[in-house]
Amino acid sequence: MTTIADPRDILLAPVISEKSYGLIEEGTYTFLVHPDSNKTQIKIAVEKVFGVKVTSVNTANRQGKRKRTRFGYGKRKNTKRALVTISADSKPIEIFGGPVA
């Protein structure tokens, strides 16, 4: 396990998709996270960066796709996603800069 000093190094980017956007109404946010981070580090990072109370963290490792190029085959990088659920009494995270509905 590697030690990551800054919590902003754990959260790489929010996942922008139709499915993740629909989960925001339920209080679940999806982030691309550092591949070496664990659930505890992700929870602490979200609480420090956004100032909310996290109730659960689910993670998923996604294999990179094999893509054809002019010179043969290449591979996209593997990614790790975290689905973070915040408590109902926490304020919503404004990832996209505005209200959801």
Swiss-Prot record:
Keyword rRNA-binding: yes
GO biological process: translation
Keyword rRNA-binding: yes
Residues that span the membrane, as ranges: none
Gene Ontology MF terms in the entry: rRNA binding; structural constituent of ribosome
Cited Gene3D superfamilies: 3.30.70.330
SUPFAM superfamilies: Ribosomal proteins S24e, L23 and L15e (SSF54189)
Keywords, sorted A to Z: Ribonucleoprotein, Ribosomal protein, RNA-binding, rRNA-binding
Highest taxon of the lineage: Bacteria
Gene Ontology annotations for the cellular component aspect, listed alphabetically: ribonucleoprotein complex; ribosome
Annotated function: One of the early assembly proteins it binds 23S rRNA. One of the proteins that surrounds the polypeptide exit tunnel on the outside of the ribosome. Forms the main docking site for trigger factor binding to the ribosome.
Quaternary structure, from the entry: Part of the 50S ribosomal subunit. Contacts protein L29, and trigger factor when it is bound to the ribosome.
Family: Belongs to the universal ribosomal protein uL23 family.
Protein known as: Large ribosomal subunit protein uL23
Organism listed in the record: Nocardia farcinica (strain IFM 10152)
